[in-house]
């Protein structure tokens, strides 16, 4: 991806908005901006996950012109293809890395306060709650998985569209990536505790 970006930035029609959104989410991280509501979370996702996903889809879809520029000619704008898949994967990612992030720093927890408070949890106590196997952690994770469902469904509808538009190698790479998250998601639907406790190892297993 880094190699591809090096040879496309400045010679492509990739919109500036993805970089602006990415910068905005990074600024929130640096400032330690509190995330109160689910709407705050979705706004943060615009930069934290939708923007990188949009760049990835651009790299998969862009065509190289005779003038040695890259052009995006898909039927819809990038965010149409990226948004639902990105948010769905990001929610799974949050649960997968919950223990690691909670131990490292409360600032790494990008779960809105309203979800934490509804389950009698907080960022500052999340690490100890995980260590003590507080049942509220499972309730929180199940809540997140339920909220991921519409993004999963809509995202896979869009993925079907992408499979009819991308080249063989490009759609193979995309489906392999999404497939890893699909396996983690299905596992979480059956028993989210397994994903919480073994997320990193499970991802490595599913990637092989």
Question: What are the functions of these language-model segments?
Answer:
Residues 1-88, 100-208:
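Catalytic cores of Mg2+-dependent Asp-rich isoprenoid enzymes
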